[in-house]
Amino acid sequence: MKSSTTSMQLIPTLFFLTILLASPEMVEGQQMCEAKSLDWKGMCLKWRNCRQVCISEGFTDGRCKGFTRKCICSKPCFVLPN
């Protein structure tokens, strides 16, 4: 009976770790800056292709967004202190 209790305690821990590892790395308070891809041509229908183009442009991610399906690249914003 003790092993089933241990298993039941392990499930929430594994779930939490999965969520933690799957979430994007981002410092608290840090915003993401977005820009339209310069190299993408045409409508954006496959976000994986958009992401690869954005990475080749120096961004960390890319997604198809908007009604007109543009490839939008993103990366963490860096704000200089005053």
UniProtKB/Swiss-Prot annotation:
SUPFAM superfamilies per the UniProt record, alphabetical: Scorpion toxin-like
Compartments where found: Secreted
Record flagged with keyword Iron: no
GO BP of this protein: defense response; defense response to fungus; killing of cells of another organism
Signal peptide extent: 1-29
Modified residues (Pyrrolidone carboxylic acid): Q30
Swiss-Prot/TrEMBL keywords: Antimicrobial, Disulfide bond, Fungicide, Plant defense, Pyrrolidone carboxylic acid, Secreted, Signal
Family: Belongs to the DEFL family.
Protein name: Defensin-like protein 7
